Regions:
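Gly/Ser/Thr-rich phosphate-binding loop
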Residues: 2-76, 90, 97-102
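Conserved beta-loop-beta connector loops within the AMP-binding
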Residues: 84, 88-112, 146-147, 195
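Short loop/turn microsegments at loop-to-beta-strand junctions
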Residues: 88-90, 133, 138-139, 183
Length: 197
């Protein structure tokens, strides 16, 4: 959409557009800034999946009364996160032994979600590894900060292990897309004899 708008800036009347919702994958902050600075449009992002029917979290520049006095930079820091939990749902981040990790913005683990409309099983395909004690195991690696914002680190299958370190492909892609002249980026691991990937 951005490319279309840049190529034909006067073709579309966007004077009534104030918000744009994005889903499917997290937009880079540079794209959210562009919409706000060039068009005055707030890009709202959320996190969810088919199994959450569909929305689990939502992120806005000002999502709480306490955010009214945040600087613009702090507001963009907030919308870069996956957002705050929708009412009626519960989120938890757990380690490999199913123990909850602190909601400190640093501790990373497997994202679990539950609630009255969250998928409890797959029709004719039980997949017990996708469920644990009433929680849906999302397959996302995430953390929750002190204000209860969800921050998706990566899909567990997309993490890159290099030299004993786990590297988020999403973080790398976001840094690359923030560079001038870069529109899209994809980071894919390759096998390496010394570094693993």
């Amino acid at each position: 959409i951005r490319n279309l708008l840049e190529e034909n800036p006067k073709k579309y009347d966007l004077s009534k557009l104030s918000r744009l919702t994005c889903g499917g994958s997290a937009p880079p902050v540079s794209l959210m800034r562009w919409y706000f600075e060039k068009l005055g449009v707030e890009m709202i992002q959320g996190w969810g999946m088919t199994e959450t029917n569909p929305l689990g979290t939502l992120s806005r520049k000002v999502a709480k009364r306490s955010h009214l006095n945040l600087t613009e930079e702090q507001q963009f820091d907030n919308i870069a996160k996956a957002g705050l939990l929708m009412p009626g749902l519960e989120l938890e981040i757990v380690d490999e032994n199913w123990h909850p990790v602190p909601h400190d913005g640093d501790s990373v683990g497997e994202l679990l979600i539950r609630g009255p409309w969250i998928c409890a099983e797959y029709y004719n395909d039980p997949q017990p590894e996708k469920f644990h004690d009433g929680w849906l195991v999302t397959g996302d690696v995430a953390k929750i900060d002190g204000e209860e914002y969800l921050i998706i680190a990566d899909r567990s299958k997309d993490l890159i292990k290099s030299g004993g370190e786990w590297i988020s492909s999403v973080d790398l892609e976001n840094h690359i897309v923030a560079l001038n002249g870069v529109v899209q980026a994809a980071v894919v691991a390759q096998k390496h004899p010394k570094w693993d990937e």
